Design a protein with these regions (language model features):
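Append "Primarily bacterial transcriptional regulators
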Residues: 145-148, 152, 157, 161, ...
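N-terminal regulatory/effector-sensing and dimerization cores
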Residues: 1-51
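A short, Lys/Arg-enriched amphipathic alpha-helix from helix-turn-helix/homeodomain DNA-binding modules
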Residues: 112-150, 171-190
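Amphipathic alpha-helical segments enriched in hydrophobic/aromatic residues interleaved with Lys/Arg
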Residues: 48-94, 99-100
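…primarily DNA-binding HTH/wHTH and HhH modules…
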Residues: 208-231
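C-terminal regulatory or interaction extensions
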Residues: 102-113
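Terminal helix-turn-helix DNA-binding modules in bacterial transcription factors
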Residues: 163-202, 224-231
């Protein structure tokens, strides 16, 4: 299954012989879910921002469950519309999306070796980013930067990191950044402001705020031998 969000375009480019793709498509306007419970939570279905090559691969049993939802929605549309129709369409649509969330979780687990390989590549790229002056050249590391580096969409990459590490991608990046920052802070020949610029922060106060929020003390306090600081 491939999911397409608003304003996204997908096209099929056949190779060699003419190939006509076939299957089912479910397309709905945002007005359908506006003001509903599904509308409030639609952003949680992050697979709408996945790239087409990050499609959901269904087992036969999973496919049957999805087709039941498709058929239920289709039957509600083709029969005479009554006051129950919209509610039943929405409940089946939400059920379909919840199934897809479950099946993507299964896919992440069954492809654990692939996921672990991506984590290892991410670690390598992140360490290189921190250690090879990219902080000053490019600025603070972002989720989209590493997703692009690994040829993944940001949402798919973020969901994969969350499944593998228990942390969001940005939390994981901040964790590694602050570990590197702790090393820098212990170099007392440089001021905290200098270090913050070296770490890619435009403003020293932003670094101080993040450090204190995550570590529990300000950078100057962490540097001081008089304070028993967390590690």
């Amino acid at each position: 299954m491939v999911f397409i969000g608003p304003n996204q375009i997908i096209k099929h480019e056949p190779e060699g012989e003419i190939h006509q793709p076939y299957g089912k498509a479910l397309i709905f306007h945002s007005d359908l879910i506006k003001g509903t419970n599904l509308g409030k939570h639609i952003h949680e279905y992050t697979f709408f921002s996945y790239a087409s090559y990050e499609a959901l691969h269904l087992s036969n049993k999973e496919r049957e469950k999805i087709l039941v939802c498709f058929d239920n929605i289709e039957n509600e549309i083709i029969q005479n519309i009554d006051r129950h129709s919209k509610k039943l369409i929405l409940s089946n649509l939400e059920l379909l999306l919840n199934y897809c969330t479950r099946f993507y979780d299964r896919q992440f687990i069954t492809r654990e070796n692939i996921g672990q390989g991506i984590i290892e590549q991410f670690e390598q790229h992140l360490n290189e980013y921190l250690r090879h002056e990219k902080l000053q050249e490019i600025g603070l590391p972002t989720v989209s930067f590493f997703a692009d580096t690994l040829n993944l969409s940001p949402n798919y990459f973020g969901d994969l990191i969350k499944k593998e590490t228990g942390k969001s991608a940005i939390e994981y990046i901040h964790l590694k950044l602050l570990e590197y920052a702790k090393e820098k802070i212990m170099d007392k020949t440089k001021s905290i402001s200098e270090i913050s610029y070296q770490l890619g922060f435009k403003y020293p106060q932003h670094f101080t705020r993040l450090f204190k929020q995550k570590v529990g003390v300000a950078p100057n306090e962490y540097r001081s031998p008089k304070v028993d600081c967390p590690t």
